[in-house]
Regions:
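Ligand-binding face of N-terminal immunoglobulin V-set domains in extracellular IgSF glycoproteins
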Residues: 1-8
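Active-site mouth of glycoside hydrolases
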Residues: 12-202
């Protein structure tokens, strides 16, 4: 049971392409993108997330790109606050800035059930999307990326398809959502251009 009301004056709807070369909100208000990227701000501590939101609030940025999956890189070697699947990650206790390149999506020691999504992971991302929405900031989701030590970049086509279906079903209703298929798609050695074309048509 719910009640439908007119949109508030701050709610201009989702951003669309306008007159081929421009962007505008659904109600026709022009949108001029001033974006930034904070890859896994959403998977940090509550304190870091609050700091990020406060920084954004006091900036000119009106769009931020960030990941659904955790990211493995030399400035981000810690474990995320949660994982997208039920299971356990590879032991990262011996991970250093000197050896981090030895860890890849093919690293042994990960045990995930790719048929069971960790619901709390996605619920938390939804809260981040809503916090951005309430600040008038577009949430540009990077759905896949190759910077990985957990095996998420190595999923099969069937596992990818289930993941895409789930992510779209969860997040597509939010008016501030944008979709980035992937960062550095060409670094996924086992995926073809045809695979990416298929994802783009979803």
């Amino acid at each position: 049971n719910f009640k439908v009301t007119p949109a508030s004056s701050e709610n201009h709807g989702p951003v669309r392409v306008a007159n081929t070369w421009h962007f505008a909100y659904e109600d026709g208000t022009p949108y001029y993108s001033i974006g930034t990227t904070c890859y896994v701000w959403d998977l940090q501590s509550d304190e870091r997330i609050a700091q990020t939101l406060e920084t954004l609030k006091n900036s000119a940025f009106n769009k931020i790109r960030f990941c659904v999956f955790p990211k493995h890189y030399d400035y981000n070697l810690g474990e995320p606050r949660s994982y997208p699947y039920e299971g356990t990650p590879v032991d990262s206790s011996v991970l250093t800035k000197e050896n981090f390149l030895e860890y890849t999506g093919k690293t042994e020691g990960n045990h995930w059930d790719f048929t069971r999504f960790h619901v709390e992971h996605f619920q938390h991302i939804e809260k981040c999307i809503l916090a951005l929405r309430d600040m008038g900031i577009e949430a540009d989701l990077i759905v896949m990326h190759p910077y990985d030590r957990w095996g998420f970049s190595q999923m099969t086509i069937e596992q990818d398809a289930l993941y895409w279906k789930y992510v779209i079903a969860r997040f597509a209703a939010y008016r501030n959502i944008w979709w980035s298929l992937a960062n550095e798609y060409d670094l996924f050695e086992h995926k073809t251009v045809e695979d990416w074309e298929g994802y783009a048509k979803i």
